């Protein structure tokens, strides 16, 4: 009997260890209304970005009659929809990337150390929760926070590390990173 309890305790400890602590950022809150026979019913919609600041990020939206409940729902949805993004040196993107959603377009560029996060509004929240320290990003078209975050996530999903590229092509990482001889001769 005691052995079974010890096993259960170890399993509980392991599940607690595997659940990393997530940081969250509230991006937008909107007051929404529904017109009914007796008048208008007001509610709130929240947009939240959640990440572990080590390469995982997700976003969610929640709607409820009260603000805290909407934020809680959005946070839960964001935790369920997290994606993993390969980061170079744990601080920036591997390559320049473009993301689109609806009328929104986002261009993200890898940056040298010390650049910081040069991005506006909702994109900044995504990069901070992801753990990116150096990036230059520009949003074009739709300035709607939902579209901007979805376009940013679209671009991040396309991000791939040299290891992933090498695996797809059936080559070694050194072959992917190697410069062509023409460039080496000029340099």
UniProtKB/Swiss-Prot annotation:
Chain's role: With S4 and S12 plays an important role in translational accuracy.
Keywords from the named record: Ribonucleoprotein, Ribosomal protein, RNA-binding, rRNA-binding
Lineage: Bacteria, Pseudomonadati, Pseudomonadota, Alphaproteobacteria, Rhodobacterales
Gene3D superfamilies tied to this protein: 3.30.160.20, 3.30.230.10
Family: Belongs to the universal ribosomal protein uS5 family.
GO BP, sorted A to Z: translation
SUPFAM superfamilies: dsRNA-binding domain-like, Ribosomal protein S5 domain 2-like
Domain named S5 DRBM: residues: 22-85
Protease as UniProt keyword: no
Record text about domains: The N-terminal domain interacts with the head of the 30S subunit; the C-terminal domain interacts with the body and contacts protein S4. The interaction surface between S4 and S5 is involved in control of translational fidelity.
HAMAP family per record: Ribosomal_uS5_B (MF_01307_B)
Pfam families: Ribosomal_S5, Ribosomal_S5_C
GO cellular component, one term: small ribosomal subunit
Region of interest: Disordered: 1-20, 154-174
InterPro entries referenced in this protein's UniProt entry, alphabetically: Ribosomal_Su5_D2-typ_SF (IPR020568), Ribosomal_uS5 (IPR000851), Ribosomal_uS5_bac-type (IPR005712), Ribosomal_uS5_C (IPR005324), Ribosomal_uS5_N (IPR013810), Ribosomal_uS5_N_CS (IPR018192), Ribsml_uS5_D2-typ_fold_subgr (IPR014721)
Name of the protein in question: Small ribosomal subunit protein uS5
Superkingdom per UniProt: Bacteria
Organism field: Cereibacter sphaeroides (strain ATCC 17025 / ATH 2.4.3)
GO molecular function: rRNA binding; structural constituent of ribosome
Subunit details: Part of the 30S ribosomal subunit. Contacts proteins S4 and S8.
């Amino acid at each position: 009997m005691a052995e079974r309890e010890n096993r259960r305790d170890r399993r509980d400890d392991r599940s607690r260890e595997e659940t990393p602590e997530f940081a969250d950022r509230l991006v937008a809150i909107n007051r929404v209304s529904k017109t009914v026979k007796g008048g208008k019913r007001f509610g709130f919609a929240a947009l939240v970005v959640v990440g572990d600041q080590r390469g995982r990020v997700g976003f969610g939206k929640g709607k409820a009659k009260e603000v805290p409940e909407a934020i809680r729902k959005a946070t839960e949805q964001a935790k369920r929809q997290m994606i993993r993004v390969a980061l170079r040196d744990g601080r920036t993107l591997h390559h320049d990337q473009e993301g689109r959603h609806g009328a929104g377009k986002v261009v993200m560029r890898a940056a040298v150390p010390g650049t910081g996060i040069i991005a506006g509004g909702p994109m900044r929240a995504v990069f901070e929760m992801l753990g990116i320290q150096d990036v230059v990003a520009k949003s074009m078209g739709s300035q709607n926070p939902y579209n901007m975050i979805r376009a940013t996530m679209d671009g991040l999903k396309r991000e791939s590390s040299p290891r992933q590229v090498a695996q797809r092509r059936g080559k070694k990482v050194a072959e992917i990173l190697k410069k062509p001889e023409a460039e080496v001769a000029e340099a």
